[in-house]
Amino acid sequence: MRLCENQMKTREFTQILQENPGKALFFEYQTGQYVRTDYHITEIKNVNFDTVDCGGIRNQWSEVHIQLWENEIPEPDHAVDTSKAMKIFEVVNRVRETYSEASIKFEYGNSVFPTAVLPVHNIKDTGNALIVQLTPDQTTCKAKDRATSPEEKAAACCGPVAEKPKLTLVSLQQSDSNTCEPGSGCC
């Protein structure tokens, strides 16, 4: 349905929910690993970041984090579909507006997967369900990322990644015996 080359905006996500009423809503947090079908949406967070990177530049941005939670005791009669998810957004928006133009991410963890904030990679429509495929973010160095000139790249505290040293093969001397003595050159 939608492959996200850039991070999905909250507005895009809610639009997909609205266009697909009553469909099951599943989350894949790793390839082949799914949030249990009886999950709850427990919070919708407007998150504001105000950071200073290692190059001394201030960075500010906002995101929306949706917290997914699984009860310790499975609830086979509980499920969140696209319509119920939209109702939760509506409840939140009655209290305060959700940042519609901010990137949307999902906060999830369980006993075998540490809690992480995961962006949307893709949303698959199977006909009767939407599968939101999440993927982990990579950390990065903003000073290195914004450097465009050789001088800026050299000044970034994280600099370019050094190339791996090339390994060379060393010839082994042939020996008539199957033993190896220190200093003999056989190993």
Where is each model-derived feature located?
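Charged, amphipathic alpha-helical segments and their flanking helix caps
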Residues: 2-4, 11-12, 73-99
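Small/polar-rich, solvent-exposed N-terminal microdomains that initiate assembly or binding
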Residues: 14-43
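A generic structural signal for short beta-strands and their flanking turns/coil linkers
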Residues: 23, 35-37, 60-64, 100-102
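Short, solvent-exposed beta-alpha or beta-beta edge segments that form flexible loop/patches at the rim
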Residues: 34-58
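Short secondary-structure capping micro-motifs at structural edges
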Residues: 48-56, 72, 89-93
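Oligomerization/assembly interface segments of phage tail-like spikes and tubes
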Residues: 60-72, 134-136
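Helix-rich interaction surfaces within compact, conserved domain-sized segments
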Residues: 88-145
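Mixed-charge, glycine-accented linear interaction segment located at domain edges/termini
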Residues: 135-178
